[in-house]
Amino acid sequence: MSISSSIKSIQDIMRKDAGVDGDAQRLGQMSWLLFLKVFDAQEEELDLEQDDYKAPIDEKYLWRNWAADAEGITGDKLLEFVNDDLFYHLKNMVVNAEKNPRGLVVKAAFSDAFNYMKNGTLLRQVINKLNEIDFTDSTERHLFGDIYEQILKDLQSAGNAGEFYTPRAITKFIVKVTDPKLGESIMDPACGTGGFLACSFDHVKENYVITSADHETLQKQIHGVEKKQLPHLLCTTNMMLHGIEVPVQIKHGNTLNKPLSSWDDEIDVIVTNPPFGGTEEDGIEKNFPSEMQTRETADLFLQLIIEVLAAPVNGKQGGRAAVVLPDGTLFGEGVKTKIKKMLTEECNLHTIVRLPNGVFNPYTGIKTNILFFTKGKPTKDVWFYEHPYPEGVKNYSKTKPMKFEEFQTELDWWGKESDGFAARVENEQAWKVSIEDVIARNFNLDIKNPHQDEVIAHDPQELLASYQQQQQEIAELRNQLKNILGDALTSSTGSEA
């Protein structure tokens, strides 16, 4: 049976269980099971590679010792073991972070995990289906990477739009352009399920890793933080699938829940698609300077990114970032203007790629951009590149998503930051705006392509708000008119009398 068929069978079995309600819970259930199976596959490899290797958790809780046997415990006995023994132990085990970092990974992964299944017989069927996938087989592991991406898409379809899945084409393009290298610290402060981090890991491995020592270096380069339990667990599993043995740098928490001034500026590369359109809980904004405080998540993340990027030192270039942000960041005023002013003063905002509508369809229609900047030198010019739809395409959809090959024109045009992008030329898709013009526009970066006829396009929410405002104004005018006519009629009646 193929891996995709196994995953589908697992989801079908879970649908029969009364304890699992909806796609999100099905995926949550599958996630902790996947984690333990992938973890055990890694354990087997480490045990073979290292003499005197000691398992980071008690032997009885390793997948091979309670789940691998198709004829093993089932029914109520299995449920009792999972709920009262396995989960209790993994959540509460005492772990020394230095001596047992892999144990810490397990404890963090299970901190908020939950077994939703109420039928032990169905749970055994799910486990047996998972056992059809061999994670020690590199071919199957590679194939599972594609299936894993489908699981993440399913997660987004389950009503968690915008938080978990950035289209692979965008992730790959951003990593290709930022070009993280061996030894550079790579961070995603809102890492979701780890798409940017996995792609960065693969990029460094394929382009810069030669020796086993290089591989050890790469293991320690990847850093991520994720606020929510389920994507954090999926991200940790994702990192293990890609070959990170101890993904302790994938933290479970809110990156913004710490004073901005307490962060060190030491990150070489940041690649991220922070949540946008949402707001943070009360009090989070107090971690930021008073004049820069806001509850809008994307604005806070942009400030954080500027802060944590490494400053240039001893001839080494400052840290660089590529960040997916909505149109609202570009044209927004108030605190947004202050943030953009700070960005252009502290960093070289050298390129903004304007993405077309529908990139995140069908999950959100918000129009987005990719901002590329490097810390240490102020901005002199901002290059804009308007990414067009491919020929014959009018919009993206779930069945017709954006493809990486579409970015070849940008890649051919891109040039080198080291020479100030001297090879770049303006064309139908690309244009340059001086910082003086940006300042004159009060840092409004929503600048239209001067080489094309203006196409008026508005966000649906903006159109709705504008419509409601117009209706309110019409109602007020109607009331004024009624009052004027009423006064006129009263006056006329009085005169006749």
Where are these regions (language model features)?
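Accessory, often C-terminal, charged low-complexity segments
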Residues: 279-294, 298, 327, 335-337, ...
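Conserved Class I SAM-dependent methyltransferase catalytic core
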Residues: 22, 26, 229-232, 295-373
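C-terminal, active-site-flanking charged/polar segments
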Residues: 348-349, 361-408
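Non-catalytic, mostly N-terminal accessory regions of nucleic-acid modification and defense proteins
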Residues: 1-177, 181-182, 247-258, 354-359, ...
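Short beta-alpha connecting loops at secondary-structure transitions
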Residues: 220-223, 253, 284-290, 354-356, ...
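Conserved nucleotide-binding/hydrolysis micro-motifs of P-loop NTPases
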Residues: 229-230, 257, 275-278, 327-330, ...
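Conserved S-adenosyl-L-methionine
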Residues: 163-272, 277-279, 295, 299, ...
